[in-house]
């Protein structure tokens, strides 16, 4: 009976005229077998080489349109940006983000425009990012001190970076450290593990019983309840504290919760108001998107440097020359690190943290003569575009020099390089995330020389990927630090 119901609910893309080409399908499950094996972004790139840069897959009941070229990405994210301005909802977003009311997954409309404006103008503006410099600086110095205390020993740098970025985000959001902070971060990590990849229940939305059969609903709800309880405690603490008229905590800087609570208070003159559930959803967004993306990028950058000692030395020489010439480390120093910025750009090309950018087609449209059905899920494969020889010479070779004096960057105007997306749905936290990435890398390179553990050759360093909310390095990066320059004073 269940199979009969599923077959009845299946869309039949072959009966849709002019739909993009795609691979063979099986009854009920459709094209799912094609994604078994390699990580999805690599499988989809291989399929695109056979079926073209605009293709369709039938995954269960859902039609997917796969975009694998800069030209078609521009059609989706610029020419028809409004048509593709929503994101598909899922079990994960509905539970964790309170009915998809966060910034990243809320449907395109008035609510999304308002929360996006709050994010761009107040939460993650360049001014706000600059104001968080003392937190970043203090926490990175703490990390440097901890690593220095283990000089000559093997340090799990992946774990250290992960903890650092989550701590920076916690302090930025909460204003201070809380006893519950570590438990909250632990829950966020568990949620990210669960949310990676394709959830079978989302591919058969009419079969709600799959949510219970796979136990995904109960797992998400359990973690969400724990995180909700912790956030409730922290928000109540903020409300209890004395605040000025503008909502700033007396005797301290305004944190992200303070900013959001200004929109919860109906007695203010704000034209737009947020519920506590909305505020929690936005905070989850900042943690899940901001922290994981930054940590993943730092980890890949250090791994690629260790893979090629010549590139590592180039990056170290630049950092040390500029820091020593200026005699201090501040954001103007970071701005001068041209080679490091090029290196990060190359990391984002070959290791985009989120290689599959999800959009939803709000209404049927046509792209280059192909019919794109309403409610179909569109995936822009930024990894496929970033490794296409049409746009990049020797695309599989790691070469930071390709970005030196190049006009191409990661801010969504160059469709051959889209690590953070483009258009209305471009990642709003780019400035926040890159500020963390650049400072951490600069200080790790300045203060330490790095070597691999005994028995591991540079060229043999394992760069195997693990697909999740982000595509991270599967094996933790473990290195041996040796102090090169004086540590910051405590």
Curated annotation (Swiss-Prot):
Superkingdom of this protein's organism: Eukaryota
Ligand binding (heme): 427
EC numbers, comma separated: 1.14.-.-
Family note: Belongs to the cytochrome P450 family.
Protein name from the UniProt record: Cytochrome P450 71D11
Enzyme class, spelled out: oxidoreductase
SUPFAM superfamilies in the record: Cytochrome P450
Molecular function in Gene Ontology: heme binding; iron ion binding; monooxygenase activity; oxidoreductase activity, acting on paired donors, with incorporation or reduction of molecular oxygen
The UniProt record lists the keyword tRNA processing: no
Cofactor(s), by name: heme
InterPro entries: Cyt_P450, Cyt_P450_CS, Cyt_P450_E_grp-I, Cyt_P450_sf
Keywords: Heme, Iron, Metal-binding, Monooxygenase, Oxidoreductase
One family name in Pfam for this protein: p450
């Amino acid at each position: 009976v269940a199979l009969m119901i599923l077959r009845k609910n299946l869309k039949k893309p072959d009966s849709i005229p002019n739909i993009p080409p795609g691979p063979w399908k099986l009854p009920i499950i459709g094209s799912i077998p094609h994604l078994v094996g390699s990580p999805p972004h690599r499988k989809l790139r291989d399929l695109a080489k056979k079926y073209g840069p605009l293709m369709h897959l039938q995954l269960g009941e859902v039609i997917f349109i796969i975009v694998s070229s800069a030209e078609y990405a521009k059609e989706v994210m610029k020419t028809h940006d409004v048509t593709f301005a929503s994101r598909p909802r899922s079990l994960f977003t509905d539970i964790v983000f309170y009915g998809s009311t966060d910034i990243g997954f809320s449907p395109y409309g008035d609510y999304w425009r308002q929360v996006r404006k709050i994010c761009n103008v107040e939460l993650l503006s360049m001014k706000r990012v600059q104001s968080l410099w003392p937190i970043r600086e203090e926490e990175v110095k703490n990390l440097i001190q901890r690593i220095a205390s283990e000089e000559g020993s093997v340090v799990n740098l992946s774990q250290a970076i992960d903890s650092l970025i989550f701590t920076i985000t916690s302090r930025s959001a909460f204003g201070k450290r809380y006893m519950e902070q570590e438990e909250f971060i632990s829950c966020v990590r568990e949620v990210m593990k669960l949310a990676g990849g394709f959830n079978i229940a989302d591919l058969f939305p009419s079969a709600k019983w799959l949510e219970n059969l796979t136990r995904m609903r109960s797992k998400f709800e359990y973690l969400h309840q724990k995180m909700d309880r912790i956030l409730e405690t922290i928000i109540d603490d903020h409300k209890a504290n004395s605040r000025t008229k503008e909502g700033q905590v007396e005797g301290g800087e305004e944190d992200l919760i303070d900013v959001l609570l200004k929109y919860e208070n109906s007695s203010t003159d704000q034209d737009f108001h947020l519920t506590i559930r909305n505020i929690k959803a936005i905070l989850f967004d900042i943690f899940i998107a901001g922290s994981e993306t930054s940590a993943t990028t730092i980890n890949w950058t250090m791994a690629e440097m260790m893979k090629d000692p010549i590139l590592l030395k180039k990056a170290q020489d630049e950092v040390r020359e500029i820091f020593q010439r200026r005699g201090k480390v501040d954001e103007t120093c970071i701005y001068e690190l041209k080679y490091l910025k090029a290196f990060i750009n190359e990391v984002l090309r070959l290791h985009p943290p989120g290689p599959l950018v999800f959009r939803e087609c709000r209404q049927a449209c046509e792209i280059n003569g192909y019919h794109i059905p309403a409610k179909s899920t569109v995936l822009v494969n930024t990894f496929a575009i970033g490794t296409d020889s049409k746009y990049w010479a020797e695309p599989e070779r790691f070469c930071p020099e390709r970005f030196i004096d190049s006009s191409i960057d990661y801010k969504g105007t160059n469709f051959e390089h889209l690590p953070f997306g483009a258009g209305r749905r471009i990642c709003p936290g780019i400035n926040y995330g890159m500020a963390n990435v650049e400072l951490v890398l600069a200080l790790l390179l300045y203060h330490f020389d790095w070597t691999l553990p005994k028995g591991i050759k540079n060229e043999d360093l394992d760069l195997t990927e693990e697909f999740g909310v982000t595509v991270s390095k599967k094996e933790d990066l473990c290195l041996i630090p040796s102090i090169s320059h004086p540590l910051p004073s405590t």
